Amino acid sequence: MEEASDWSAGQMCLTAPVPVLEEWVVARTAHYDRSFLSTDPTFAHAHLTVLAPWVPEPGVADLARVGEVLAAVPAFEVELTRVATFPDGLVHAVSEPDHGLRSLTRRLAAAFPDHPPYGGRYDATGGPVPHVTLDRLGPDVTEEWVRAEVGHLLPARLVVDRVDLQWWGNDTCRRLHSWRLGA
């Protein structure tokens, strides 16, 4: 039987897919918790979070509002330049420049003020830092190890031209909707 601490009710997330890191992120997800592997072939495990947690049960008006916001934003490029670690031990790929992603997050957060990025956890520090989660520091995981493992994939240029609505939950991860930027 699952321990309560190992189970998640889940959350809605607005994300931008990062295909170049998909294989790595899927492998690391499988290493830690296979229940977060999606069987949905359109689901992007490797992603840049744009806004999460988002509306728990979005309606037609919520989806339309996201579409309106994204229609006003043209596609833009970012580069995943290097591996770094946040103070909490989250090892990630740094996205530079990050102004396009920050702007996208600000626009969506303004459209949904009851759903601040990461629940408002990073408001005092200027907002969340756009990144792709790669791993977490631990006895067998160092930043140097992750850098050596993904070094051949970085730097990587990425065109952010789509935002997906994803459901993240144990054994239920899936893509629910997708919007093109500037469309």
Describe the role of every protein-language-model region.
Residues 1-77, 98-159, 174-183:
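Basic, often amphipathic N-terminal segments
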Residues 166:
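Active-site/acyl-donor-binding loops of N-acyltransferases
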